[in-house]
Amino acid sequence: MSVADIRKGAEQKMQRSIDAFKNDLSKIRTGRAHTGLLDHIQCDYYGSPVPISQVANLTLIDARTIGVQPWEKKMVPVVEKAIRESDLGLNPATQGDVIRVPMPALTEERRRELTKVVKSEAETAKVAVRNLRRDANEQLKKLVKDKEISEDDERRAGDDVQKLTDRFVAEIDKLVVTKEAEIMTV
């Protein structure tokens, strides 16, 4: 394994951590409606759990309402039940074969709780990135120990890994600021 492989592997894993963090952020509800909010909700389709997006058409009716139109008429009550029982605190209403999912306004207290959740998720993502940095540095030390690279090369590669870590941590911080602004906007 070369220094370039270690660096590239660390970068790919750090990017995956960022992607997972973005996915977690998308599940945190803001005052505005977006179809991604329902992505992780599963409903029962012929005995197997599937995401709602695979059995229904998701659209934005307005800034605070998501429209869910199941492709099969008999799926309407199943999808509605799945949305109602999700951990998002949503109260869907059916009109014919369209389920309207209004986004309730967030209270100030709830907004503050959500910002704490965002910060907690961010800290988890930062820890994951730092752990990946540690793993990469350990691999570099092993290369020095096995006399495959010099200590100077290890130091240079370690600096590169640190720059990667700083870049990804800064990206996490930027995502947090954006999400907090989104949550606190009334």
UniProtKB/Swiss-Prot annotation:
GO terms for biological process: cytoplasmic translational termination. The keyword Cytoplasm applies. Keywords: Cytoplasm, Protein biosynthesis. Belongs to the RRF family. It comes from Paraburkholderia xenovorans (strain LB400). This is Ribosome-recycling factor. Pfam families: RRF. The gene is frr. CDD domains: RRF. One of its GO terms (molecular function) is ribosomal large subunit binding. Responsible for the release of ribosomes from messenger RNA at the termination of protein biosynthesis. May increase the efficiency of translation by recycling ribosomes from one round of translation to another. Its main location: cytoplasm. GO terms for cellular component: cytosol. It is found in: Cytoplasm. SUPFAM superfamilies: Ribosome recycling factor, RRF (SSF55194). PANTHER family: MITOCHONDRIAL RIBOSOME RECYCLING FACTOR PSEUDO 1, RIBOSOME RECYCLING FACTOR.
